[in-house]
């Protein structure tokens, strides 16, 4: 009789990738009661906020599913927190964890109760393929962004390695690129920032190249959302099998993992939303790393005041210059906002710090979402049927903005090519236009399409749905 399979999941450091990884861990063990998961937790100091509490909340769970998910904390490492050092050393940090990963997995391989079936490594942890190879087990990649982005990265890597084409040549270019995973020509100005700088493009394309060594790629998406991109990927014989298994979202966050102050803030926010009419509130939130300088904050404030719509604005203080840290809450918003703004808008708006994003998007009073277009936020807004006005900041968010606006007609645009720390301000006029557009979609096809895509995303996870079936194929593979 064959032993139950044990998969080792290795997420990148930081809460963002960890949440998606644990969602797929829960999904896997819920589908197969003979499957066990071990999650290896790396502690990179600059991005470790919230990780310990989140893991502990799951480890403390008494559900049968959680009992088959084991966590191993790898040794802590002290590192410099300056911006340059973190950017340059994250890859090196992950590489340095290889011996710790090998040690942690040694006991699993020798287990008399389970069979080590393979590694599922985060998109930034492909160096752990080396460890899997040493142990003689297969590797898979978990890609936390969308299929169109995955296709773009494979395309850029192929251009470099087969045609000697340097993607950094597209920096400041007005060119439009033909990418198989995108239906429309892609403006070079929405390429991920790291693809436009040699120091970051080269190592990142090397990471993507290693995807080709694996036995499969799990992607947090679903067929109805990205059918064109998924078809393009499956048509390329040089790319491993792609398994769309999303949308993977943490919709039932455990209140025990947040402190009592955050619970109080959440209750206060939801109470305020309870008093607003249906679909009347525009929600502005820019992710765990999103913040603006004071001049841009004033442009947003002026736009909100002139637009006249009810609003809930998550406004956070930028970290000190030169340091990599999460934005923090202001002690007092009055110093950064235009004089008298809070008094003039007190009847229609609420300015907050930290926001319980999923709970807010789920609230019936919310009718629009001004978002940085992180992939998780994009999926969350679709799940809850809330149209987005796009304002990307960093990473692949410009792609995530282009796709729903131009490819799928599921969003409106404030700015698709804006980048964090850009010297160019997005004007109050542009922001106001985007707010009005996203909030006045009552008779628009966009709101209707968003609602339809919401239903398709939910059906994808149901028995017989596209993602349900795809996950089953992956389980059969292991």
From Swiss-Prot:
InterPro entries: UDP-glycosyltransf_plant, UDP_glucos_trans, UDP_glycos_trans_CS. Belongs to the UDP-glycosyltransferase family. The keyword Transferase applies. It holds the Pfam family UDPGT. Keywords: Glycosyltransferase, Transferase. It comes from Fragaria ananassa. The keyword Transferase applies. This is Putative UDP-glucose flavonoid 3-O-glucosyltransferase 3. GO terms for molecular function: UDP-glucosyltransferase activity. The gene is GT3. Its EC number is 2.4.1.-.
């Amino acid at each position: 009789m064959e032993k139950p399979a044990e998969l080792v999941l290795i997420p990148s450091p930081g809460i963002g990738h960890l949440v998606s990884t644990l969602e797929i861990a829960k999904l896997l063990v819920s589908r197969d009661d003979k499957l066990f998961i071990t999650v290896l937790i790396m502690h990179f100091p600059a991005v470790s906020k919230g990780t310990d509490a989140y893991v502990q909340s799951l480890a403390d769970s008494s559900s049968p599913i959680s009992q088959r998910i084991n966590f191993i904390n790898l040794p802590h490492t002290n590192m410099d927190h300056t911006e340059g050092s973190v950017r340059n050393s994250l890859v090196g940090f992950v590489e340095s964890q290889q011996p710790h990963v090998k040690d942690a997995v040694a006991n699993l391989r020798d287990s008399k109760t389970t069979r080590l079936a393979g590694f599922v490594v985060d998109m930034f942890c492909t160096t752990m393929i080396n460890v899997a190879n040493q142990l003689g087990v297969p590797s898979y990649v978990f890609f936390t962004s969308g299929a169109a982005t995955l296709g773009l990265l494979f395309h850029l890597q192929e251009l470099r390695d087969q045609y000697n084409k340097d993607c950094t040549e597209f920096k400041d270019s007005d060119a439009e690129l033909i990418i198989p995973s995108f239906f429309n020509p892609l403006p070079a100005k929405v390429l991920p920032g790291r693809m436009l700088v040699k120091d970051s493009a080269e190592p990142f394309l090397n990471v993507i190249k290693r995807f080709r060594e694996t036995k499969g790629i799990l992607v947090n998406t679903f067929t109805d959302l990205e059918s064109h991109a998924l078809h393009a990927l499956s048509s390329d014989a040089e790319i491993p099998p792609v398994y769309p298994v999303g949308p993977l979202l943490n919709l039932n966050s455990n209140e025990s993992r947040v402190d009592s102050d955050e619970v109080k803030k959440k209750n206060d926010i939801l109470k305020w939303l309870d008093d607003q009419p249906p679909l009347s509130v525009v929600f502005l939130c820019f992710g765990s790393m999103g913040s603006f300088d004071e001049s841009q904050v004033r442009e947003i404030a002026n736009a909100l005041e002139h637009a006249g719509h009810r609003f809930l604005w998550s406004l956070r203080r930028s970290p000190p210059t030169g340091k990599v840290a999460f934005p923090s809450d202001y002690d007092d918003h009055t110093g950064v906002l235009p004089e008298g703004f809070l008094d003039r808008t007190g009847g229609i708006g609420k300015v907050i710090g930290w926001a319980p994003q999923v709970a807010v998007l789920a609230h019936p009073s919310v009718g629009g979402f001004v978002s940085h277009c992180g992939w998780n936020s994009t999926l969350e807004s679709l799940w809850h049927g809330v149209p987005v006005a796009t304002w990307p900041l960093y990473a692949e968010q410009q792609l995530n903005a282009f796709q729903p606006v131009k490819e799928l007609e599921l969003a409106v645009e404030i700015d698709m090519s804006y980048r964090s720390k850009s010297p160019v301000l997005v004007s109050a006029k542009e922001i106001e236009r985007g707010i009005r557009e996203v909030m006045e979609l009552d008779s628009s096809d966009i709101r209707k399409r968003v609602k339809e895509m919401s239903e398709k995303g939910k059906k994808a996870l149901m028995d017989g749905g596209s993602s349900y079936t795809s996950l089953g194929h992956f389980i059969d593979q292991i």
